[in-house]
């Protein structure tokens, strides 16, 4: 294992943060898998999973079982990790710019597309190499000018040439669930089943500008551009990415993290990144994928106290009671009902809400939303 420390641009005088990455196997060896945790810095289950995954990787490396390359970043956001306000962690948004740490990643296909599309030929693997080389050159020539930009640039530089990228997050209160691109799902389905995901949300493009989509969408967009231009050059999905939501913010325990780390390790063996004894058989799925465009965000019609009737993991029908929002001044209770059939896969932790605030999310099977599919 090799540890590499990446100093970020200093935000102010006398203050500089460092991102640390841990490298296993041989650089450049295929397949390459990149795993990071806690890009939203207050989302800590993934950080503990990375802590438990590391000794498994060290043991595999010592036994000569790592056949590819693995990069592990257990603390993907030292900027957000240092942010607190009134004793509360503030790791989702950069307090200086107001930007979400997992948004505003670039459209790399738009950047490299005009030049790289002309270079693609009849050999699929050669085309993958050409695209990765173009991405490498673009990132090498990019010069970030802020601390936040340098964090994004460093993460992309570590991950851009990976075959698979796992971005470990969590929700407020939730079951374990997945976000991934439709093109990536076949490759990542065994991982979801090893982890016993209870909701799987698929999208072709959520238009969110998230870290994982930045890395997978470049391949989808370039392939679409080839088709639009009538170019028959083959371009496989060179990078499959997923955001794994490891339950809720308070689900930080050794028992859960050890099980999740072992599940990820089993998937690494299943994909051939790690050799040695055969991986356990992929478990049967606990759910079927549903479209992200079919996910309902249940909102509060008025301000008040929140009393949930539905628990995370409940299978709801249209009209089922999700929560009551109580106004103790007006002595009114507003019943908030499910608008779609599906699993209530996430809900808020707070028990007071403002009018229009998000209460919960239900994974419906029928698409009904368009445009930007992820919130702030």
Q: Which ranges hold each PLM region?
A:
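Structured catalytic-domain cores with a bias toward divalent-metal coordination
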Residues: 1-376
């Amino acid at each position: 294992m090799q540890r590499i420390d990446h100093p970020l641009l200093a935000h102010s005088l006398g203050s500089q943060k460092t991102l640390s990455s841990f490298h296993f196997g041989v650089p450049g060896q295929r397949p390459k898998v990149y795993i990071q945790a806690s890009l939203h810095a207050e989302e800590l289950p993934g950080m503990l999973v990375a802590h438990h995954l590391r000794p498994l990787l060290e043991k595999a490396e010592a036994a000569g079982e790592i056949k590819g390359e693995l990069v592990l970043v257990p603390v993907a956001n030292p900027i957000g990790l240092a942010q607190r306000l009134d004793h509360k962690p503030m790791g989702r948004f950069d307090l200086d710019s107001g930007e979400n740490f997992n948004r505003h990643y670039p459209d790399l296909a738009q950047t490299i597309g005009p030049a790289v599309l002309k270079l693609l030929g009849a050999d699929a693997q050669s085309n993958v190499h050409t695209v990765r080389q173009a991405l490498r050159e673009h990132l090498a020539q990019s010069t970030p000018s802020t601390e936040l930009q340098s964090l994004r640039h460093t993460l992309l530089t570590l991950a851009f040439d990976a075959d698979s990228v796992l971005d470990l997050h969590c929700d407020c209160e939730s079951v374990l669930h997945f976000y991934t691109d439709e093109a990536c799902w076949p490759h990542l389905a065994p991982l979801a089943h090893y982890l016993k995901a209870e909701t799987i949300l698929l999208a072709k493009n959520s238009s969110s500008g998230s870290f994982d989509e930045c890395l997978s969408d470049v391949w989808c967009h370039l392939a679409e551009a080839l088709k639009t231009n009538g170019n028959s050059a083959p371009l496989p999905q060179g990078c499959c990415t997923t955001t794994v939501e490891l339950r809720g913010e308070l689900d930080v325990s050794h028992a859960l993290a050890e099980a999740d780390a072992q599940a990820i390790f089993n998937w690494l063996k299943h994909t051939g990144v790690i050799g040695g004894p055969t991986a356990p058989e992929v478990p049967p799925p606990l759910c079927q994928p549903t479209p992200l465009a079919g996910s309902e965000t249940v909102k509060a019609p008025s301000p008040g106290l929140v009393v949930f009737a539905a628990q995370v993991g409940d299978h709801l029908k249209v009209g089922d009671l999700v929560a009551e929002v109580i106004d103790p001044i007006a002595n009114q209770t507003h019943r908030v009902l499910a608008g779609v059939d599906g699993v209530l896969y996430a809900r808020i932790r707070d028990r007071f809400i403002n009018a229009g605030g998000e209460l919960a999310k239900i994974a419906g099977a029928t698409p009904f939303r368009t445009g930007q599919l992820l919130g702030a």
